[in-house]
């Protein structure tokens, strides 16, 4: 579970997520970023992970009221979001190029980095790349969570995401596309076909789906 608080208000339950219990700090920070709850790390006063309780407790620098409407995203692990809107994100104007011969080597690197995925096929993997090598890789039972971990690690390690390439073993749905738009990635590569909503959204956002 994820709970938030600030110095003036009591603890508030924010969300309950199913997750592979590794890199939970990255998961929480990425989730908060994608949902627009934080803009940068300065918005987090403290973060405590209580693994034995399955709880992450975040102290925010400013008051936050959780939306009453929660949307459960597509996928077998049932991700959660407070918004599915693409409108906040302007089209990505990028001069970055991706050659066809780069795609397969990058996917091979993703598979090599995702050892649990290769061993079990029971989790999803995701990665951020500069076109030649992987900068970050993460695995989770949920494909949405894997992207949250990528975003969280990028923020905590100050690794730029804009203009990079996002890779995933999972299907690119409209919710996954929204996360790519948030990161500013002009290319999203997946081993599975995207949904029709993702294709339409990608046209609006200037994102190439492969």
Language-model region placement:
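Intrinsically disordered, low-complexity regions enriched in acidic/Ser/Thr/Pro/Gln residues
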Residues: 1-129, 136-137
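Surface-exposed beta-strand edges and their flanking turn/coil or helix-capping segments
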Residues: 28-32, 42, 70-73, 141, ...
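Short, surface-exposed, charged/polar-biased interaction segments
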Residues: 49, 124-127, 131, 171, ...
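Short alpha-helix boundary/capping segments
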Residues: 19, 138-142, 194
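A mid-sequence, solvent-exposed acidic-amphipathic segment
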Residues: 111-169
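Feature captures the catalytic cores and cofactor-binding loops of soluble hydro-lyases/lyases
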Residues: 144-210
């Amino acid at each position: 579970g994820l709970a938030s608080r600030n110095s003036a208000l009591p603890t508030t339950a924010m969300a309950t997520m199913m997750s592979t219990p590794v890199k939970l700090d990255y998961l929480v920070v990425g989730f908060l970023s994608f949902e627009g709850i934080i803009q940068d790390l300065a918005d987090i006063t403290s973060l405590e992970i209580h693994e034995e309780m399955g709880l992450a407790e975040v102290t925010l620098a400013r008051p936050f009221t959780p939306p009453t409407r929660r949307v459960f995203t597509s996928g077998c692990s049932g991700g959660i979001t407070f918004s599915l809107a693409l409108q906040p994100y302007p089209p990505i104007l990028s001069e970055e190029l991706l050659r066809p011969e780069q795609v397969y080597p990058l996917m091979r690197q993703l598979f090599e980095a995702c050892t649990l995925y290769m061993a079990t096929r029971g989790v999803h993997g995701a990665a951020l790349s500069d076109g030649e090598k992987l900068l970050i890789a993460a695995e989770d039972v949920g494909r949405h969570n894997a992207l949250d971990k990528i975003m969280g690690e990028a923020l905590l390690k100050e690794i730029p995401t804009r203009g990079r390439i996002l890779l995933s073993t999972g299907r690119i749905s409209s919710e996954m596309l929204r996360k790519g738009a948030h990161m500013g990635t002009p290319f999203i590569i997946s081993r599975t076909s995207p949904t029709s909503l993702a294709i339409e959204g990608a046209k609006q956002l200037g994102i190439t789906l492969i």
